[in-house]
A protein has these predicted regions:
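Extended hydrophobic leader/signal-anchor segments used for secretion and membrane insertion
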Residues: 1-113
C-alpha cells in the first residue's frame, strides 16, 4: 500500500539548484502531493519544463497580471508564472521563451521541505 501511495499520491524529490534558497536548500529532500487541488499564488510546485523537472513558487495564477523587473505579464487561462525565491540565481519564467507553465505540466504541490 505504501508503494502504491508513493506512485500515485506522493512524490519524493530533491531541490536541484540554489534557485529556491533560502526557503529550500540545494539538494534538500522535498515531499510533494500529486492530487494537489487548487493552486494559489505563493504555492511551491514541482513541474515539468522542456529542460527538466523544476521546483519554483507560483508568482501569478490564471487571469492575473503581474509586473516582474519592469515587464508586465498577463497569465493565460490554465497557466502559471513561476519564479525562484533566489531571484539572482534562478532560471525561471523570466528567462523562458514561453514564460508560462500550463497546469498539466505541474506534477505536484510541495507539502514538506
Amino acid at each position: 500500500i505504501i508503494l502504491i501511495l508513493f506512485q500515485t499520491v506522493f512524490l519524493i524529490g530533491y531541490v536541484p539548484s540554489e534557485s529556491m534558497e533560502p526557503t529550500l536548500k540545494e539538494n534538500s529532500l522535498i515531499l510533494g502531493f500529486r492530487p494537489y487541488g487548487e493552486l494559489n499564488t505563493g504555492d511551491i510546485v514541482i513541474f515539468e519544463h522542456e529542460e527538466g523537472v523544476f521546483v519554483k513558487r507560483i508568482a501569478a495564477c490564471p487571469g492575473e497580471e503581474i509586473e516582474v523587473e519592469g515587464k508586465t505579464y498577463y497569465v493565460p487561462p490554465d497557466s502559471y508564472l513561476l519564479l525562484g525565491d533566489n531571484k539572482e540565481n534562478s532560471y525561471d519564467s523570466r528567462y523562458w521563451e514561453d514564460p508560462f507553465i500550463c497546469e498539466e505540466k505541474i506534477i505536484a504541490k510541495l507539502l514538506l521541505p
